[in-house]
Amino acid sequence: MDLSKIASTINMRYYSQLGGFQVGGAVSGLDTQSIINAILEAESQPLQNLTEKYEKYELMQEAYTEVKTKLREFRDLVYSFKLQSTVVQKTAVSSSSLLSAEASSVAVTGVYHVKIVQTATYTTLAGASEVVPPPDSTKTFGELDYMYTPQEGTVRLYNNETGNYVEVQVLSTDTIDDIVSKLNSALSSAGITGSVSYDTSTGKISITSDKNFSLVDITGNFTKVFHLDEASLNYSGGNYSFTSTASVSGLSTAKTLQQIATYTSKTIISGKVKINGVEIDVDQNDTLSSLIEKINDSEAGVTASYDYHANRVVIISKTSGPEAITLEDTYGTGLFSLLGIENHSLYVGQKAHLQISMDGTNWADVYSDTNDVEYNGVTFHISGMTSETITVDVRVDTDAIVEKIKEFVDKWNETMDYLNEKLTEESITDKDEEEMTEEEKMKGVLKGDDLLEEIFSRLRGFITYKAEGDINYLWELGISTGDIGTGYENMMKGHLEVDEEKLKQIVEEDPNKVWEFFGGENGFATQLDDYLWELVKFNGRIDQVAGISGRIEREQRFLATQIASWIERLSKREQELWRKFSVMEEVISQLQSQGSWISQALQGSSNK
């Protein structure tokens, strides 16, 4: 008999005391193992009964865990019906895409006339000067390494109307004046009337011509250095124009603060600065990118950025409305001077401003620091400016409320059907236990269970629960067990049906009365939620039966003690049987030896 398998049921470590293989019947010819197993099988019936009971309790615990999960899911929905926002749903429809709206459960219904006076804006600090001023025209091409490392090479100027082109060699030692002169000569050679110029105030090259043309790097990176590779050819008044999209001194954010200081002949010292009173570490070896990241990751409440097209640093508050941005360089690092923001323009953020009227005559001014403005339980979301008066229609969302209540009824029926199934389902008897799935094993384990019967009956009793208020019973909402004929059967099963037309009518009359029925102090959902909570909470009714320290667990511990005792008893019995059969085998062996000796003696006597 396999006692180790039974021991594993209660997580008991079992070691046979027999040791090694037992071989019997060598002398007697008996199948000793089978005989002992048969004896143990007969004597172990009480152990089998205890084990089956233990395993059933284990399945009951699993089944109750599933029941608890189902009731938790049901309670989650029931709890939401205590909230006014669940039952009293309202919708808001705007006449403009520039203003959307959301209506809460307490929103005043009606048509809102809305004027957008001002959107909320962010405080912006913009540097008064470029970070690196444009170089004068005597700078050589090789020195213009603000964003890219200059590479001398060949640039080709195409006359797109004739297909002719002229190539210009750009050398590292060429000054900007030299390059402009070469390009002007190339225009003439390509049959184009026009001019090339460099503006020292903007750091940009401009080309004008009477013919369609293009400029392409064959080797080197002249057009990239002067930001001509991003430029578009414009046509106006019979002339074409082509201008750099950014100053040649526009910076790569990979440049260190020390490198930037070299361009501007300014000084940068490692230390600390304060933005909005928050200290930020500054190291002269910080890159522009890493410095910006430090600022943005700090608690200063601002977002810094560098726009290489404008060649300026901009700092913007993270929250809209009239927020302050303050700069302090108390350690004398020279950072703000280096970045061109020591002198700056400060554009203070504005509050959002709406004018709202319910009658189109009397207007209320409503302000908000953000573009989300609340009024009368309605939140208006501004996404742009318009001079038009916008209408927002706020009304009860009857369909949404009806669908939510139908969802509740569906969940109720699903829960009651599940409980009823667990109470009435039969165990599977046409399969061996080894062939069954866990789900099949659990079938029938809660049939007629006392606690489950109580839960089912209590929930079914809520169908006739009387709530306080203008609506007292479910049937007044059109929720009942059905018409005569089906009503009794549904009542026994705890099954509900919805008269959708009646429910819709009640909701349209006054959705707040519907919510009061569900979510009032003694409302249907309030009382139902309280009962469900008593069932599913830690150490609640279900845990007291099937929890860690519940009745089933205590029963299992008691059974495990009995099972362990029986295993020990049968183990000793098995040893005893093997010992007795071994003695028997030895006696038979001796008798056979004596018989053989007598036979040999008699045979010897007869031969004399």
Curated annotation (Swiss-Prot):
Localisation: Secreted; Bacterial flagellum
Pfam family, one: Flagellin_IN
Primary localization: secreted
Annotated keywords: Bacterial flagellum, Coiled coil, Secreted
Annotated Gene Ontology cellular component terms: bacterial-type flagellum filament cap; bacterial-type flagellum hook; extracellular region
InterPro entries from the UniProt entry: Flagellin_hook_IN_motif, FliD, FliD_C, FliD_N
Positions in coiled-coil regions: 47-75
One of the GO BP terms on file: cell adhesion
The organism's place on the tree of life at top rank: Bacteria
Keyword field contains Membrane: no
Physiological role: Required for the morphogenesis and for the elongation of the flagellar filament by facilitating polymerization of the flagellin monomers at the tip of growing filament. Forms a capping structure, which prevents flagellin subunits (transported through the central channel of the flagellum) from leaking out without polymerization at the distal end.
The family this protein is said to belong to: Belongs to the FliD family.
Oligomer and partners: Homopentamer.
Protein name: Flagellar hook-associated protein 2
Gene: fliD
